[in-house]
Amino acid sequence: MLAGSAAAASQQTAGFALGRTGGNIRPFTVTIAAGGKVSVSGPVQAGRTRLTQAQVAALVKLAADVRFGTLPKTTNCAGTLPDIASTFVRVGARTVRVHGTCIPRYTRLWKALTAAVKLS
């Protein structure tokens, strides 16, 4: 098995989470289990309660494509006001937090995750 494939398999087993924290807005967390079950905590709603294995696999592939494992664990984007909340994405055991919108690879994964669960 290739190293990238092993990492992708590990990420798929552990699932995903995304959310918002800090700032002056209520935090939330959305969790996508490896089996596709979607759970929500906080003031948001997910339009899907379960993703198919194909959808989970596509998210795992995207995480690999954006090289999620190489993103810095914490980024404070220049010019972002302190009262703006930070967002986070967890893939497997690795969590990345970003305050602002200065990392396009992170933003691409964030948007894919929110679209997959139909976050509102």
What spans do the regions from the language model cover?
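Bacterial N-terminal signal peptides
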Residues: 1-3
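Short, well-ordered, aromatic-rich surface patches in folded extracellular/luminal domains
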Residues: 6-21, 50, 55-57, 62, ...
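Solvent-exposed coil/turn segments that connect beta secondary-structure elements
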Residues: 21-23, 35
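Short strand-coil-strand connectors
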Residues: 24-26, 41-43, 92-94
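Residue-level marker for the onset of beta-strands and adjacent loop->beta junctions
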Residues: 26-28, 85
